[in-house]
Amino acid sequence: MIPPSGAREDSGDGLTGEATGTEQPPSPASTSSLESKLQKLKRSLSFKTKSLRSKSADNFFPRTNSDVKPQADLLAKASPGPSPIAIPGSPASMPTKAGLHPGSNSKLHAFQEHVFKKPTFCDVCNHMIVGTHAKHGLRCGACKMSIHHKCADGLAPQRCMGKLPKGFRRYYSSPLLIHEQFGCIKEVMPIACGNKVDPVYEALRFGTSLAQRTKKGGSGSGSDSPPRTSTSELVDVPEEADGPGDGSDMRTRSNSVFTYPENGMDDFRDQMKTTNHQGPLSKDPLQMNTYVALYRFIPQENEDLEMRPGDMITLLEDSNEDWWKGKIQDRVGFFPANFVQRVEEHEKIYRCVRTFIGCKDQGQITLKENQICVTSEEEQDGFIRVLSGKKRGLVPLDVLVDV
């Protein structure tokens, strides 16, 4: 029996309603699009997790549930929008390992057989891992800890730190190592030094600062000559004597410098004068400061002192290492320190009349014509030992004349 058309339409509508009421199976296109969205979410979550782990040092300690919750909240805020439908059994719907195993980072070492190609030291006994044919040993696959086979039995259970992130090794390890390296020095220095200052160190430091100050003052005027402010203080100060009779006097004088309160810079000219008059062997300060010019010096500035070979110079100031202040008769000025030679009381000054080329193997030196030299020795077999600047050796006496 054929049902009427109205009934057929009603039944058709009922079937349509039933079909819409029941859940239709997803199409392959919708399933693939859903899987692609899940893969994108997984990649983004893994990238964010790696970036967060590389910037933090909390991975070295076991995290608890309270530590995992802020990270989950941070990831939820970082990816706003409608969350995709979770498919049962998919990786996104599975709980994280940190939530299930809060102490997963505290696993033990996983040692494996390893052949070491480079020289490696055992982390337990600190001896090199060697072998007859190959350097066999044990190595942890995660933290790369290397030990001997014999050291594995006596090794206590230790927590494996895992593989260090590159960002942590780069930004955190070096400062920690530097602080640990110099930590013992920081502890020892206050105990060793204290508040006591060595007087010798104070005097040397003050002399260095004074020399630098004079150099700066001389460079400002266009020449390396030191200023004339301290010349009056150093006129009467002699240099150290080389004679045997003045050894104790000079030693007492040098030791007394550090007993003055202001780094030994008090006025001690009176003491120098009294010391020079003690005993018959004391030398004249003027004779102690006598120099002879070795070369000719043409003045470059108004304050420079013109010199010719053989001129006798009285030293007035030697605070600067390169430029000294001296006096020739009634002329006063600055001259290079390496252009003069000191003359003692018992020394003689000679001039070379012709060029002499000496043999170094025989202890001789070369002298040019009109070169000045100083000696305190006597003639031996026609030769005499002279001193000219930094050169010292034998020259024949017939090429020298007195100045």
From Swiss-Prot:
Tissues showing expression: Expressed predominantly in brain Detected in brain neurons, more specifically in hippocampus, cerebellum and inferior olive. Highly expressed in urinary bladder, and detected at lower levels in adrenal gland. Detected at very low levels in heart, liver, lung and kidney.
Residue ranges covered by zinc fingers (Phorbol-ester/DAG-type): 108-160
Residue ranges annotated for the SH3 domain, each copy included: 286-345, 348-403
Gene Ontology CC terms, in alphabetical order: cytoplasmic side of plasma membrane; cytosol; T-tubule
GO MF assignments: transmembrane transporter binding; zinc ion binding
CDD domains: SH3_Stac_1
Spans traversing the lipid bilayer: none
Annotated Pfam families: C1_1, SH3_2, SH3_9, STAC2_u1
Stretches the record annotates as Disordered: 1-51, 212-264
Subcellular location: Cytoplasm, Cytosol; Cell membrane; Cell membrane, Sarcolemma
GO biological process: cellular response to heat; muscle contraction; positive regulation of cation channel activity; positive regulation of protein localization to plasma membrane; positive regulation of voltage-gated calcium channel activity
InterPro entries assigned to the protein according to its UniProt record, in alphabetical order: C1-like_sf (IPR046349), PE/DAG-bd (IPR002219), SH3-like_dom_sf (IPR036028), SH3_domain (IPR001452), STAC1/2/3 (IPR039688), STAC1_SH3 (IPR035508)
PROSITE patterns: SH3 (PS50002), ZF_DAG_PE_1 (PS00479), ZF_DAG_PE_2 (PS50081)
SMART domains: C1, SH3
Membrane topology: Peripheral membrane protein
Low complexity compositional bias, start-end: 222-232
Biased composition (Polar residues): 19-36
Keywords: Cell membrane, Cytoplasm, Membrane, Metal-binding, Repeat, SH3 domain, Zinc, Zinc-finger
Compositional bias of kind Basic residues: 39-51
Free-text function comment from the UniProt entry: Promotes expression of the ion channel CACNA1H at the cell membrane, and thereby contributes to the regulation of channel activity. Plays a minor and redundant role in promoting the expression of calcium channel CACNA1S at the cell membrane, and thereby contributes to increased channel activity. Slows the rate of calcium-mediated inactivation of CACNA1C calcium channel activity.
Quaternary organization: Interacts (via SH3 domains) with CACNA1S. Interacts with CACNA1H. Interacts with CACNA1C.
Name of the protein: SH3 and cysteine-rich domain-containing protein
Organism: Mus musculus (Mouse)
